């Protein structure tokens, strides 16, 4: 069931100045708009493949922009930045001009430069409703690599404030961000829309876990068992039954961008402590297999550091997981770790949302907005430093898997995660986001099948 105007589907444009495949929230917007009777033009850059549901939807058009020339990388850093921004501004503006005419445009921020001024100007000259989906502040991300008082950071902040106030309305990812937008910049017309996990993130059967472990064992020996139908975690009997091994190791999973704003050294030192504790008390702690997904500039540094340690009780692997296997991995794990530390302190990590959707408890590093998602000792664990993470891991896995104390102690975790999973994206979107689009289109609304 959806909304339809003037006996036809109204056009909406979604803009993200980034890889469309790495923009899950914008993919979700597109799917919900299509379900509610809109034609959607999703504008961004090519890269990883968008969600299969988006690719199959006949009412969603993907418009890819031409990336900036690689030659810009040979220029001095500041000049390269300005040239890239100029290129993106021109490409984005002409892409919008040549796209189907829309009644509403929703852009993702960040990045806000040049997206905000370009989208605002386009909406002015075409009389299009201008909406912003605030995921974070771009200037705080820029300040990570520069400094808080750098001129470019000031300009970025000024741009977000000026053009953010010109929007007709918008969405944001946390209550903390909504309050901050109002108090700091006087931006009032913003509605909170929390991220929710996609349907592909869900609990799985023991057989599905076994199939994943068998697949991983062909590449990573730490998963291999002592017979062809056995892994260190599971075993398939001749009659087809799959059981968990009584002496199985624990499986820890983390997804990281391998950048400075996700400090992997925190997990590295916690694992080093765990190695020592397991060596000293082998009867009380299981071996640990750690799967770290993602790619980034510091990946090679830390993988080399792990290799140098030659740990005997902790195995760390960094596989590239397909879009199909990643949700299965989360659902097969015993604990997730999130190292995301928000540059503004106001956004929430999508990776935790996905883990919760998979019924996986998470240990996450603390920052101001995090308790809006992770409730300490209710659906997850919050730590502030490497020492606290080390203690959490040791507490969580003590006696694992033979003793049931952990499962009994954290029974409420799984009950609360089941409650979290009941609240789906589209009903939340319909309540909080759909009215913004309905206000932006003309004509009498009616329900249509």
Regions found by a protein language model. Give the residues of each.
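N-terminal subdomain of nucleotide-sugar transferases
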Residues: 1-64, 278, 282, 367, ...
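A charged, aromatic-enriched C-terminal amphipathic alpha-helix characteristic of glycosyltransferases
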Residues: 384-387, 401-448
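An aromatic- and histidine-rich active-site surface loop
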Residues: 23, 50, 85-92, 102-127, ...
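Nucleotide-sugar-dependent
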Residues: 262-265, 320-329, 336-354, 364-372
């Amino acid at each position: 069931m959806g909304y339809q105007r003037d006996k036809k589907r109204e056009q909406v444009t979604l803009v993200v100045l980034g890889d469309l495949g790495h923009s899950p929230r914008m993919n979700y917007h597109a799917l919900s708009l299509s379900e509610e009777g809109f034609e959607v033009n999703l504008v961004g850059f090519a890269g990883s493949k968008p969600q299969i549901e988006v690719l199959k939807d006949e009412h969603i058009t993907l418009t890819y922009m031409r990336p900036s020339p690689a030659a810009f990388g040979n220029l001095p850093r500041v000049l390269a930045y300005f040239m890239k921004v100029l290129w993106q501004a021109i490409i984005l503006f002409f892409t919008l001009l040549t796209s189907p005419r829309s009644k509403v445009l929703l852009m993702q921020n960040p990045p806000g430069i040049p997206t905000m001024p370009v989208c605002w100007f386009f909406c002015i000259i075409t009389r299009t409703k201008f909406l912003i989906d605030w995921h974070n502040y771009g200037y705080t991300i820029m300040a990570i690599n520069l400094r808080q008082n750098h001129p470019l950071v000031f300009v970025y902040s000024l741009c977000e404030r000026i053009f953010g106030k010109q929007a007709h309305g918008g969405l944001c990812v946390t209550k903390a961000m909504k309050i901050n937008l109002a108090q700091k910049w006087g931006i009032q017309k913003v509605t909170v829309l929390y991220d929710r996990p996609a349907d592909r993130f869900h609990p799985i059967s023991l057989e599905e876990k076994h199939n994943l472990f068998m697949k991983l064992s062909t590449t990573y020996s730490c998963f291999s068992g002592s017979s062809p139908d056995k892994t260190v975690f599971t075993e398939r009997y001749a009659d087809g039954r799959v059981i968990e091994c009584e002496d199985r190791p624990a499986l820890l999973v983390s997804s990281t961008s391998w950048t400075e704003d996700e400090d992997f050294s925190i997990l590295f030192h916690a694992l080093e402590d765990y190695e020592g504790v397991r060596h000293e008390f082998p009867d009380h702690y299981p071996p640990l297999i750690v799967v770290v997904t993602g790619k980034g500039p510091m990946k090679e540094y830390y993988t080399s550091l792990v290799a140098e340690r030659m740990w005997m009780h902790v195995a760390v692997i960094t596989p590239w997981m397909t879009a199909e296997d990643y949700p299965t991995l989360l659902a097969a794990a015993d604990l997730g770790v999130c190292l995301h530390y928000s540059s503004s302190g106001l956004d929430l990590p999508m990776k935790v949302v996905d883990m919760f959707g998979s019924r996986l408890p998470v240990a996450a590093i603390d920052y101001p907005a995090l308790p809006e998602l992770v409730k300490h000792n209710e659906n997850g664990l919050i730590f502030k430093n490497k020492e606290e993470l080390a203690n959490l891991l040791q507490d969580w896995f003590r006696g694992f898997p033979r003793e049931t104390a952990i499962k009994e102690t954290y029974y409420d975790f799984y009950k609360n995660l089941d409650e979290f999973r009941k609240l789906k994206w589209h009903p939340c979107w319909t309540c909080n986001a759909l009215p913004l689009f309905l206000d932006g289109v003309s004509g009498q609304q009616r329900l249509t099948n």
